[in-house]
From Swiss-Prot:
Keywords noted in UniProt: Cell adhesion, Cell membrane, Cell projection, Disulfide bond, Glycoprotein, Immunoglobulin domain, Membrane, Neurogenesis, Phosphoprotein, Repeat, Secreted, Signal, Synapse, Transmembrane, Transmembrane helix
Residue numbers on the Cytoplasmic membrane side: 1617-2012
CDD domains linked: FN3, Ig, Ig_DSCAM, IgI_5_Dscam
Fibronectin type-III domain span: 885-982, 987-1086, 1091-1187, 1191-1285, 1379-1473, 1474-1575
Protein name: Cell adhesion molecule DSCAM
Organism: Homo sapiens (Human)
Secretion signal span: 1-17
Region described as Required for netrin-mediated axon repulsion of neuronal growth cones: 1617-2012
Gene Ontology biological-process annotations: axon guidance; camera-type eye photoreceptor cell differentiation; cell adhesion; central nervous system development; dendrite morphogenesis; dendrite self-avoidance; dendritic spine development; homophilic cell adhesion via plasma membrane adhesion molecules
Chain residue ranges for the region called Disordered: 1718-1810, 1855-1883, 1971-2012
GN (gene name): DSCAM
Amino acid sequence: MWILALSLFQSFANVFSEDLHSSLYFVNASLQEVVFASTTGTLVPCPAAGIPPVTLRWYLATGEEIYDVPGIRHVHPNGTLQIFPFPPSSFSTLIHDNTYYCTAENPSGKIRSQDVHIKAVLREPYTVRVEDQKTMRGNVAVFKCIIPSSVEAYITVVSWEKDTVSLVSGSRFLITSTGALYIKDVQNEDGLYNYRCITRHRYTGETRQSNSARLFVSDPANSAPSILDGFDHRKAMAGQRVELPCKALGHPEPDYRWLKDNMPLELSGRFQKTVTGLLIENIRPSDSGSYVCEVSNRYGTAKVIGRLYVKQPLKATISPRKVKSSVGSQVSLSCSVTGTEDQELSWYRNGEILNPGKNVRITGINHENLIMDHMVKSDGGAYQCFVRKDKLSAQDYVQVVLEDGTPKIISAFSEKVVSPAEPVSLMCNVKGTPLPTITWTLDDDPILKGGSHRISQMITSEGNVVSYLNISSSQVRDGGVYRCTANNSAGVVLYQARINVRGPASIRPMKNITAIAGRDTYIHCRVIGYPYYSIKWYKNSNLLPFNHRQVAFENNGTLKLSDVQKEVDEGEYTCNVLVQPQLSTSQSVHVTVKVPPFIQPFEFPRFSIGQRVFIPCVVVSGDLPITITWQKDGRPIPGSLGVTIDNIDFTSSLRISNLSLMHNGNYTCIARNEAAAVEHQSQLIVRVPPKFVVQPRDQDGIYGKAVILNCSAEGYPVPTIVWKFSKGAGVPQFQPIALNGRIQVLSNGSLLIKHVVEEDSGYYLCKVSNDVGADVSKSMYLTVKIPAMITSYPNTTLATQGQKKEMSCTAHGEKPIIVRWEKEDRIINPEMARYLVSTKEVGEEVISTLQILPTVREDSGFFSCHAINSYGEDRGIIQLTVQEPPDPPEIEIKDVKARTITLRWTMGFDGNSPITGYDIECKNKSDSWDSAQRTKDVSPQLNSATIIDIHPSSTYSIRMYAKNRIGKSEPSNELTITADEAAPDGPPQEVHLEPISSQSIRVTWKAPKKHLQNGIIRGYQIGYREYSTGGNFQFNIISVDTSGDSEVYTLDNLNKFTQYGLVVQACNRAGTGPSSQEIITTTLEDVPSYPPENVQAIATSPESISISWSTLSKEALNGILQGFRVIYWANLMDGELGEIKNITTTQPSLELDGLEKYTNYSIQVLAFTRAGDGVRSEQIFTRTKEDVPGPPAGVKAAAASASMVFVSWLPPLKLNGIIRKYTVFCSHPYPTVISEFEASPDSFSYRIPNLSRNRQYSVWVVAVTSAGRGNSSEIITVEPLAKAPARILTFSGTVTTPWMKDIVLPCKAVGDPSPAVKWMKDSNGTPSLVTIDGRRSIFSNGSFIIRTVKAEDSGYYSCIANNNWGSDEIILNLQVQVPPDQPRLTVSKTTSSSITLSWLPGDNGGSSIRGYILQYSEDNSEQWGSFPISPSERSYRLENLKCGTWYKFTLTAQNGVGPGRISEIIEAKTLGKEPQFSKEQELFASINTTRVRLNLIGWNDGGCPITSFTLEYRPFGTTVWTTAQRTSLSKSYILYDLQEATWYELQMRVCNSAGCAEKQANFATLNYDGSTIPPLIKSVVQNEEGLTTNEGLKMLVTISCILVGVLLLFVLLLVVRRRRREQRLKRLRDAKSLAEMLMSKNTRTSDTLSKQQQTLRMHIDIPRAQLLIEERDTMETIDDRSTVLLTDADFGEAAKQKSLTVTHTVHYQSVSQATGPLVDVSDARPGTNPTTRRNAKAGPTARNRYASQWTLNRPHPTISAHTLTTDWRLPTPRAAGSVDKESDSYSVSPSQDTDRARSSMVSTESASSTYEELARAYEHAKMEEQLRHAKFTITECFISDTSSEQLTAGTNEYTDSLTSSTPSESGICRFTASPPKPQDGGRVMNMAVPKAHRPGDLIHLPPYLRMDFLLNRGGPGTSRDLSLGQACLEPQKSRTLKRPTVLEPIPMEAASSASSTREGQSWQPGAVATLPQREGAELGQAAKMSSSQESLLDSRGHLKGNNPYAKSYTLV
């Protein structure tokens, strides 16, 4: 039974399972029509597909599945339908012109495609033609390609030809979308060509050419519009583009007006009027309607009326898109349709049409709604909505997925064994839709409610049904197989398991079983009780199984009988259960086998209507009784059909006495007995013989028109209609008609002849057959009526003017025929003068003749012969051309050359006769035409000719004649022309070459001989190439303008040290002359371009390295190799670099000896020639080999206890390799025993234990490398002591570390007891305990750690260890390495393309400089470049810079710690300036009537190469300039083709890299006789600005007066400046002696006054200025872009105070003495504040956190207020606790960035002090207490007397460096206070003097320079502040300082003299330096200083008014 249950469950699962991941879809849903050529065949893929793979089938539209027809039709396995090529005789409408569809089917369902109409196009001959057209000149012509209607649908016009030349749509010719050719703006010459169209068959690809048609062009004549092109109706789909043609002929040009549905159409947006008509873009359904094109002019109106049908594509959409439901539910689908209103809609399910039924409802007006109730599993699948309208169709589909509602067992009970009286509960949890019903059985017997079994049921929240079977007290009879069965409308499922109740085994009685023969049967043994031994089955005492069809399952007692057979399997079966070994029980069951009926198959034969039918149904086997019944089409047969059924025993027969069509259908015979019911079905088809529905009758057909011969029939199967034809009216001899595109059989059987021809007349037979009965046929006669046709007429004809002309035409057709003649659409009256018409009949034809007597020119035109009869009319157009002699041609000059003249002519009226030739006459201008040279019979096909062999520059006269067949024309117009120049015939002379560099050659030459120039030499071509014997290098060509008889040119960018060949050619306007003879020269030698390659180095010993390399190629040497240079240096262990050395050799290898052992060396190799060193190779690194190390640098030993000592040592000074270990030796002499101990290579101490007390030991240490043991250290004696004194094993020395790192200072001490350790630091010579804080601490082992070490941590540290028995001390010198200080960068030399920079390095920060990074940027650019520079360099030259351009530079030094701070930005300019034109040169070298030579030698390039030269000129009074542009400047330039006797404006613009210059001039060409013309001043010429020339003259006089005044003022300034220079020279001579005195003082110590240490200093860090006095204590940093802004109140009365804004704070504790700060602002450019010049953008900012900070002392508090730019560093008053506050304010001077300000810039090494001030600054520096340890160096130099502009570094374009100036005086130009060595503890103090640029800046001088001046001035004044305020600069970025509390000044006594004041002034500690209080004192009196003060302040007080900048001296 279990097997049965599982089998049932599996069968249900197979039936109702579904792959929800399967799908169906359409690949190409738009495929609805396939048209192909019969000669090619076609492949049609099925447009449907699916996943998993689908089964594809093709059907006809009738629903019949198609089959393969060999060689004609085949369906491929992939579903592709193939139609093979076929001849026309094999055409079958059923196959080749039919509607198909395909289906795709997989487990998801089945879908069918849209109907696909497949149509074959038969190949048939056809012709296309074009008709002649008429039009008027200037109007439009339209040609149409006429295609036969039978093939019109398949033919496309692809192109048009004009005399075999393809036309392209353009300005005059337009090919429309319909294939018409439009010719716009028709000209007479358009009528000279033939036009034809080219067509292509869309499916066969065949092309056809039409006949040639002519265009007859007439002169414009007033006429009403006549339509040339129009339309009647158009059909289009929405979204397409539609063109509605409408074009008319008329004069004047007609107007067009469009109407839609009788309303004017607005032509905008999508509606556009075009040349061809109306263009509608993106059409819409609303655009459908009637369109009218109205064409009108004043002579009439014409219309084109048509209709536009816009169809919207059909679209069907089913909703919802996804349907997922369950069995038994309702599903509703809706299909919405767009694109049509009257459509046919149908529904399909799985490809089959769906009709309304019991559970199916279709509702809606258009059947758009589908409702399905009580869905069953078979209702799932694909549903489609089909919409059909005419030939269009659309569909949509949706997949309806029905969830499997079949009941499923979720969980159930399991087999178990229970004891009697034990309760049992069985559960079945079932899921299904709808909810299933659960029943229980026990051994196949139903279990009813009540008794011992309790059944309950519930529904869970998940929708599951749970049924429980409970047994409260089980008994043995309750045992057995329990089954729960769940069923609903979707199916049934069961589950069973055995419940065993312990007790005696027995068998429950079993019921007899009925089995069906041929099927499987299961017999279950109903055993109860448990346990038992076995279950066995017997049949007739035979143990089963005994054959293959019997299976006994011993474990559950089930017997299976497969394929039951009545004879064998029927009988009694016994189940035997073995209860105990000797005890068994049994039960029997009887099995009865029933045999089901079997019907012998039968089929209906072929029957025809009216016949009798008898069909028997015989049941050949099966148990009786058997009942037999019949059905038709699945239903009982109604009695009305007259069908008789006879049943006898096991047979039944069906009889029909009179067969009719209503008997068609499927008949089923059904046989039933007790076993089963079976059926057999067969189809009865009643066949009907054919008969006519419509019989053919005699008809008339009109020639050229279509005719339908009616014939239709009916029958079953559908009859076939065949037409046959017999030509003529005789006895019919019928033959099959060959069907083609012209003759076709319609679907109803009628015959269509699309274009009737005369040969179609005759008998036609319509034959109908369908293989049922006899065929039927009927004949008819077709009579062809011929309309009137013109069969013969001349298209064109000619007549000679004044002679008689006849024209005839022949007409054919049904009589009578009327013929009339027309001229230009006007009927000719035979009675008209000069016209005579005659008509006669000749057989079937009518001939009409028109005579013209005589012909005149006006007769030229179009005549038409018009024939008319009852069936039609025809017309023949004849073009008559009246011929006469031609008009003369109009000639013009096409081209003039030196020896040829090319004519071009335009032919006038040709006399209506083709031109037969031309005659050309040519003569010298002075000769008569009788002597002219004649060229006759020039081809008429030509319109140009060339006259050859003329002389250059000669003048000729030329004329022409035209000839045709009638005669010769009059002579043409006469032309006079002068020949052009010819190319020179001679080469340039005296060509010389001179190499001037390694890449340049200077070329000089002279012009060719005069008689060979053939014109004016305008330039030359220089050809040069690398010269090689046997080589064939092409010449490189350079064009050069001429500058005179002697020329010079420099070739640049040549290859170095290379031989070149050079030629020169002269050029004039005509071309280039012959080349000069090739000259050879060689460029100069240069340094090698590349380094040696393959540089290799191998260490051969600890002190030597072997180096080898490859030599350079010849191309890389650039000269003759002189040798190689090897540069090498050691890379030391601490990162420092050793000495750089070099060795020279001539060989490609070298051995380096005497090197350091085990040292890494950097090696570079270069090659050098006679020109110098080449490029170095890349560095390679090689280390020398290891050697034994040196002895340890130091050894210490100390007793740690009575039996132990410690030994420590330092590593060897010379490691010579990698230390592998250290060996410690210990020995004592009595007895001599030496012990060895090994220590690791990173250990520097060792403990030796187990020694004897009070015994001396000797210890020493040896280092070991891989090369062996090194030398021994010194021997130390040590003695173990019980009372061991404190000893430190660490060595004294120097410890170096980078800053910002953690450093540990070791101090390892030993002793007994353990010593105490303390650390001291030396501060100013006084040791003090180190500070222990968060950054400093002492470890337990005595080591001292400093975290994040800083520069101030440097110094001497002492470690002291002591215990009871002694003490020890070491001193460690900690040196903290910091990034290097900024270098001082200067400009040492400038050229036009390079700048040489030099620098002085700053403090290296305790680590050697590793290199420099130079950054540079072009002015006004934000892009910076950089170069790495070797640390040994102190200068660098930047090459290839732009000439006359400003550049910015910064420099950064790098050491082992990292890069230092960036130097100040300096600026320098390469030499050169913009071009200038010399006033000494004349611009115009020569002027004649039409040419001017300009002298360009006057242009000075300013030192920079000219990059462009632009010249423009124009006649006065015109606005258009003639422009000439060059990239280089020649010596001269010639203006050609000028107007005679005309004034011209000329302007030139010449540019180089430094700038551009312009020059304007006026000139006048000469009269034809060489005389000059009147000047411009005599006429009033209106210029562009509207000023007359007289007004311009007034303006010129005004400007001249102003210039004269400025010039006089300039002369006055020069005189004043000269006097001041003389006074300055005198002061310099006076200062020389003072300099000598100061230099002698340099060797002795200056007496200084005792001063208290300054505690208050204010720091102001301003870029581009440096303070040369440093103080590192008590300082703060203020923004590096700041400016000090001092208000008047700051230096006013003490009671006045002001507030300010604070952003940076500096605190001061007390007031310091004002000894006067010294400020150097010399590196700032006067007038150009670097911080406010936004275009001077530098790289990283120059601020630094670790470098020394510059400081300023407080000045006197009572000085007046001023605002200063950042060009200054100012002393600022401060009080205790005062605060700096910063605010930003900007004020930009208009002249700050002018080039004048640039030219007066001073370099970063300049200062504006006088020589006296410099000397006094030096003397004052020696008095400073902080500089007492400094070493002073004084540099004596010469100071130039030139202006500050000439002393500016890098700004003078005429000097290369500062030293180029002429020296005039010597003296001190720099002194330096050098810092002492670090162990001396000194500070660096540099010194300089302030620079005051303006008279009012006297207040900024330090007290020792200004006290004598101020103290020697008396008298009150009120204008002091005002005067100083006027002398100040405009503020830039400023800082406002708060007014501090004014301290009471200490009075000072005036010195007796200025010198005593300056040299002897002393200051009291803690006092404030002040000036004497002078109420109302006027500072303006400062201008009245004495000569001594003037000497002190030199130019400061004298530059007021003229030059605001002071004299500057350069500090080197």
